[in-house]
Structures are given as structure tokens and as C-alpha cells.
Amino acid sequence: IPDERNPFYTLPYFVIEPPVLSEKQEEYSDSKLDEFEISEAIHFSNGGGVYKAISSIDGSQLVIKEGRPEAGIDAMGRDAYTRVEHEGKILEQLKQCSNVVGYREIFKEWEHIFLVEEYVEGMSLQQWVASNYPFESNDQEEYAMKAMKLLENLKHAIEEIHSCGVGIGDLQPANIIIQKNLSIKLIDFEVADNIECEQPTGLMTI
């Protein structure tokens, strides 16, 4: 049986859907999710998926983050629903920060919560280092100049976020997106909080 990792409900060819499920599907046919065309599943976990989507309203490329209740429990006892809901509030607070992924909206559908963000073109800092590392000695100077530029941009982004009263909580290479002109966008603010908050994040990053 093929394990099709589709971002939507799929039946195996040999399964006939029971009438009760078909009726329920029709009952929930009017959905906020109909405003989006899901094009790709970026990530799956028991706490919820992360999906690339296109808005059927304005055609913009988006990322939709799903949080499921009582699943994906972290070290602080928070489930994925709570973390995604919290991230939405943080991103709304940081809407004026140019180096933070753009917040669009947050909504609830059935028992799950969905956070809609802009889709950021680029690669993670982790990928950038792997792609640009100077294996030849004559590339070292150019690499060093680019790395210093990235550090300056990252420092500015962190200062801007702190000026809005927010501590990131999960700053790691995978959450730093490098764009074509070496500008950056920070993503993943699930464990961000008030900068004065002394509660641990429950993660092993800074």
C-alpha cells in the first residue's frame, strides 16, 4: 500500500467510505480552509502539519501551521494547539518588525487551530552555510564578508524584536531564513515570550 503523504484526506483505492463519514464531510463542507489551496506538506508531526498554500482570495503564497489539542506535548506541558495559538499572538505583536515572518491571521477549524503566515523565499542559515562553505582557500575572503553581513543583519533583527518586548526563545540556524540579498527573516516563534519572562522554554536552543 503506497504511503501517500498528501496534505489532504486520501482513501486507499480498495476502501469504500462509510455513509456516516460522507454525511459528516458534507456537514463540514463550508470551511475557512476552502480559502486556501494546499500545494505541499512541508512537515508532519502528531502535533499538526505545516503546509504551503496559495490564497484563493489574492493569490499570495502562504504557510499554514496547524496545532492539534492534547498532542505534541512539550517539556512545559503545553500542547501544539496552545503553542500555535501563542505564536499567533507573538507574530501579531511583531507585525512592524521587517525581519520577522509576516503574520496574516489565525483561525479555528473543528478542534484544530491554524496560523497563516507569509511564505518566505530563501534557505535556512543551516543550508546557507552548507552551500557556501569555502572549501577552496581563495573563497575564504568572500565567505567571511558575507558571513559578517549576515551577522550584522541578524544582530539588527534581534535588537528590533527585543525593542518590541519579545524574547525569541528558539534562535537556531533552521529558523533563520537567508534571502537573495543576504537579508534575513526569522520564523518559528512558538516559544517566544515577554522579554522579561523567566520561565524556561522547554527547548534545548537559545
Whereabouts are the PLM-identified features?
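Structural motif at the C-terminus of the N-lobe alphaC helix and the adjacent alphaC-beta4 loop
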Residues: 89-98
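ATP-binding glycine-rich loop module of kinase domains
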Residues: 39-40, 46-85
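Catalytic-loop of the protein kinase fold
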Residues: 162-173, 178
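Juxta-kinase regulatory segment immediately upstream of eukaryotic protein kinase catalytic domains
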Residues: 1-39
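Activation segment signature within eukaryotic-like protein kinase domains
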Residues: 150-151
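Short beta-strand micro-motifs within the conserved protein kinase catalytic domain, predominantly
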Residues: 102-113
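Activation of the activation-loop gatekeeper triad in protein kinase-fold domains
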Residues: 188-193
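Conserved short submotifs of the Hanks-type protein kinase catalytic core
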Residues: 111-124, 128
